[in-house]
């Protein structure tokens, strides 16, 4: 970044310039290899960062205090450097950077262990992979930091800015950082998808999130790994631009979760168990924004924010994921208290309707009883209502059923073939996204495209179980069908009206349906009514 590389450049301290020494003796620590010699004139060049900033000398207690005093010009430059609140204070020393790296490692390792040992609600494979790679990333950073500090100590100095510069220029760390941040940003998309309830909103969040994540990481990789031959404005603007893009994405992520908190504030306030977790989530999702504000006020914090960037992503993923788990448990308990259960949305209703879950199939009327049913005015009213519902269901099935779609195989019209191609592409894309949402992101739905894990007993065991004749039948206990005496005739009437043959051509459309739970509802209607 432009200001990251330029903020150290300024006035050159006097101790970093070549110092002319008068006649004297030259003493080396390796006196066996380099014996003591007498020189008439010498030029001394002190180790400095970017040839302008003095560094911490590790030989002060060994050489200077024992054999000689420091040069006056060196002591004066060090006092001037440490008095500078921007560069030489303790907050920007190598000690604070070591503490920052150590704290980051502890936080990431703790959250990784928390994710891997969470047996109540198992996290997705994407979250597990991201946290494990984050652990590998911080482990590489710690090992590389130890090697760099060991080299500095061997050369007789310690400097935090040089440590950060070498860490940022180390390609293996940059490659792992690219992969880890990409996966963690996709995890943020996963959490946003868990907030939305409609499948249409989840698909849109998946599409927009994946595109934004890939675009930001590609630009970041270009800014990190591509060095233009000629220095121009693009080489300075691109790193700053991608930095602002990451901050904007983090702000959008935090804003979406905040809006969801506000919309569910009554449920949150009614459950004291998630108060602390909600407050912690609300604070931690804004940590990248806090680092950005600190960066604007003080440019050096950007160096520390690069160390904490992966930590911010891990915290911003694991804590909201756990909050979503707790909140979903509360919502499931609330839905169990009601009769209707969870709500269905329009896109789910149309998808469920092609499985004919909401279609009341009418028995074919016998020719002998045709006049008898038409004599009763009540039956006429019920028949009209049932006819209207049957027309509506037939209309829905006609638009969604694969058997009623026109066959354009022999149609040579380019427009029809193009429309058919678009339809097939759309169906394939929706199937792919639904598989990713259900399998990869561990976001279950009421209706899934796979029934491999669903077990049940089949009707007509003696017949051949072909692909289009399988029907999963849940096991019901006999006690569920016990009705009061007064409502027995109502049950018989409803069963006669809603009975349907089990061997229909639409049975194959009732496959691929998950039944997560069922609730027994008994309507006690007296015989007088």
Swiss-Prot record:
Family to which this protein belongs: Belongs to the palH/RIM21 family.
Residue segments, region Disordered: 364-417
Swiss-Prot/TrEMBL keywords: Membrane, Transmembrane, Transmembrane helix
A biological process term (GO) from this entry: cellular response to pH
Transmembrane segments: 97-117, 131-151, 173-193, 205-225, 242-262, 274-294, 299-319
GO cellular component entries: plasma membrane
InterPro entries: PalH
Organism for this UniProt entry: Candida albicans (strain SC5314 / ATCC MYA-2876)
Extracellular-side segments: 1-96, 152-172, 226-241, 295-298
Lipid bilayer topology: Multi-pass membrane protein
Stated name of the protein: pH-response regulator protein palH/RIM21
Cysteines engaged in disulfide bonds, as pairs: none
